[in-house]
Amino acid sequence: MIWERGRARIEALLAAGELESAAPNEQHAQRLLDEAAAHLEAVTRVSDVDAAGALQLSYDAARKAAFALLAAEGLRPTTKGGHIAVQDAVVAQFGGREGMTAFTHLGRMRRQRHAAEYPGASTPKVTRRDADQAATDARAVVEAARLLVASGKLDRFD
């Protein structure tokens, strides 16, 4: 099935060199989903001692799950596009009011992860509550991506 929703945004990301075409690869998508699940399992082990690390792992789980959708379609982010291109592509195709709401958390999660990785002197410390919310949001993203990949409706983006 050709996924029409978000097509204009994907084409713009391709034209801007933020995404590139690759061979669609469901095995690669599954590997990314498995890695995302492993990250979430690790979150349960570290959140008590390292809230910032747990938040970062949660974000990485969500990002890998989002990338799994693109891998299934034969798309991958370039160095230029990076995490933002993955977020933009997935939200355009699968998120928003007409899609799966889990993907709407990606932008906030990316910004929180960035603040945790590169804190300023006045940046608040990541709390256990922050880490728990990130884990909840990441689980929703991973589950939504898993359902979409398993649906068999993702084909090469042409």
Where are the model-predicted features located?
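Terminal alpha-helical segments
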Residues: 1-158
